[in-house]
């Protein structure tokens, strides 16, 4: 996905071509989410129309999160939807991360600034 920063896209492609899969995906995540941070920071209308939901928050508090999304969108029947979908939402327990501690550190290094900016958007 090219979000207007061709050099960034080329850097991601170079990382992947060099076998740096984790770095490439971390940079890709940072590019996409950085675009979102800038868009929401620059446009009050877009910011007001947007509800950012972290997957971890949805899994930790599904009823509250679904209710907040439906309220944000001014959709009816929130309690029916909450009751229907909440029981099925949970954090995955079917895999262990294959990432090494060095790879997790690399991801944090590549994404820290954007991840911190995203914290204020919840």
Where are these regions (language model features)?
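PAPS-dependent sulfotransferases, especially Golgi type II membrane carbohydrate sulfotransferases
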Residues: 1-122
């Amino acid at each position: 996905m090219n979000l207007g920063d061709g050099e960034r896209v080329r850097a991601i492609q170079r990382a992947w071509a060099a076998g740096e899969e984790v770095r490439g995906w971390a940079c890709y995540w940072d590019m996409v989410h950085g675009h979102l941070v800038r868009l929401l920071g620059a446009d009050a209308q877009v910011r007001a129309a947007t509800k950012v939901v972290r997957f971890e928050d949805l899994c930790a508090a599904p009823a509250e999160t679904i209710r907040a999304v439906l309220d944000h969108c001014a959709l009816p029947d929130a309690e029916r939807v909450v009751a229907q979908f909440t029981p099925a939402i949970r954090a995955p327990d079917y895999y262990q991360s294959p990432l090494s501690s060095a790879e997790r550190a690399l991801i944090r290094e590549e994404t820290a600034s954007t991840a911190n900016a995203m914290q204020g958007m919840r």
